[in-house]
Amino acid sequence: MNNTNNMSKKALQKLELTWIGKGDEPKLEPRILIENPEFSYGDPNSENMLIHGDNLLALKALEQDYAGKVKCIYIDPPFNTGAAFENYDDGVEHSIWLDLMNRRLSILHTLLSKEGSIFVHLDDNEVDYCKVILDSIFGRNNFINRITVEARSPSAFSTVNPGVFKASEYILWYAKNKSDWESRSMRIPSPRDTAYNKYIVNREKDESEWVFIPLKQAFLEFINRDRLDKIDVFLREIYNQCRLFSKSQIEHWIFENFPIHLVFNLKQVSNYLHGKLKIDEYDNFWQAVYMYILDKCSYNYSERDIDDFVFQNSQSVFRETEISDDGAGQETVRLKYLSIEKPTQVFKLERDNGLDSVYVWNGKQISFYSKNVEEVDGKLSATKLLTNVWTDVSWEGIAKEGGVKFKKGKKPEKLLKRCFELTSNKGDLVLDSFLGSGTTAAVAHKMQRRYIGIELGDQAKTHCYSRLKSIIDNEQTGISKAVNWQGGGGFKFYTLAPSLLKKDKFGNEIINPEYNANMLAAAMSKQEGFKYQPHDSIYWKQGQSSEQDFIFTTTQFLTLEALESIKDEMQAGETLMVCCKSFQQECKSKFGNITIKKIPQMLLGRCEYGKEDYSLNIINMPVDETEQDLLDDNLEEISVQALRDNKQSNDQPTLF
């Protein structure tokens, strides 16, 4: 009974999501990455990486060198629709998916910089479960937002089933440390707000001289600017000479005296003016007919033309907004009542700290439209603040983006562009471990971010490689025009090295024969926490963990003479770890600053060697027949055997 009570109390201490297999974390092997120069392209000094292999092993391979260095992560993992789990019951199905995500998100959290953030794109099958995992790994206090994306629209084909049509997908957005993360706002295109319907003719002058007219009048005068004088003469002459004319006489008079009639319907205008010419006083007549004539003289303009005029002159376009006695500042409220007493006068309140001045007229504040106009994708546009509901990112036409086909999984380049604009700057590192058709890497490349993309499937070559290659060659789909993409740059193509250890025919674990000396040295450096960077002239300095701590791996028998020779070359304060298959007994503990470890014995039990795939085969991406032919005929896997016998040279692929 006491036992049960204790367990209940313990359970109440922490609320958590659990699943089958939780806590049974694999001991991942930190593999090295081998460049395949055949599929690297462009700038040979590029830091961009395209990795073909299991993404959990690839993330582990990156962990040592990239922990805390990634500014933005976007992942679009399998949605777990159920079709891929037909052999499992519901509980196991969810457990598999949750376990897959938990392992990867844990490493992704490690890779993020303290200012970084992650976007996880999902549908409603697992989004709520995934949020609990993200809360656990990142902390609920680091949750930024749940973004709802309108990913599809109803069509005859997609709406045959009854019920509410599912149009949305979701992006969970978390910071590594919200206190270090930079919050950014963004404005997006929107329809022009027609409530801003007044215009200041002489905005550049002192506010005491401002002249106000309706926005429509300002626009019509702008497009008729070459005929305003003629319109003025026309109105004055017709008032002076035609007040007693009949409709037909007015029509004839206009026809004979003013070619301006060619731009409007003469009979319609004559009938209208006949009634207005009876108005006493020319000024009253002018007020009654000016806008009508101005409009009739205008032709072939559209709402887009009005929009462009407003955007170009937004600093002169305004609306009047109410001033709340409770919400506004004390001085603003004072000017409100002062302006009511003097309704024709504009009052100005200058503010400190770079804030815009406040203008009050006739008891209301003048709000300029300029704050709602920004340059978007190279042109001025009406904008509104971005919210967490994204309905303006179109999925239509994305099949052609990047020149690759990718059914049921391709994301718009515009979507990734927005994510990167919210979270990163040029030169920052972004990562996608479910690269798919390569959209994340494509957008990062065009936006001049550094990137790492990981993809297990064949589309790493058929889609990602070819897409990035065409981008470097200046393809112009997707966001290319919006960012003025001109081509250039490069990337390196990597594959995961095979497992370091394998079993021989007797069941004993041995160093994998596919490893040559350089690969083994790189692998041992990674295993022991050193960075593999062979010294130009000192052969035993193959890697280092600090300025004075080095590692040396050799497959040869280590003699005391060889060890003493190394010791003589070492500088004061330097330490060395030697990893070798065998060594002379006298070498053991000979020097206090040299540690000797035997391989493969030192590696046994550390990792899960020999496992190549942690993907659980959740989905198989569709490959077109033409793409499959390309894969079969033109693309070959990197030959590790060929690398094994190569000596280190300038032509040797990079080991990472």
PLM features: what roles do these ranges have?
Residues 164-180:
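Core SAM-dependent methyltransferase catalytic element
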Residues 41-57, 61, 397-431:
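Glycine-rich adenosyl-nucleotide cofactor-binding module
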Residues 452-656:
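PRPP-dependent phosphoribosyltransferase catalytic core
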Residues 10-23, 94-102, 127, 412-485, ...:
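Conserved S-adenosyl-L-methionine
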Residues 68-83, 134, 430-444:
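Conserved proline-anchored active-site loop of SAM-dependent methyltransferases
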Residues 4, 12-14, 177-402, 413:
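Active-site-adjacent helix-turn-beta-strand microarchitecture at beta-sheet edges
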Residues 95-148:
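Conserved Class I SAM-dependent methyltransferase catalytic core
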Residues 1-72, 81-103, 271-360, 580-583, ...:
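DnaQ-like (DEDDh/DEDDy) 3′-5′ exonuclease domain used for proofreading
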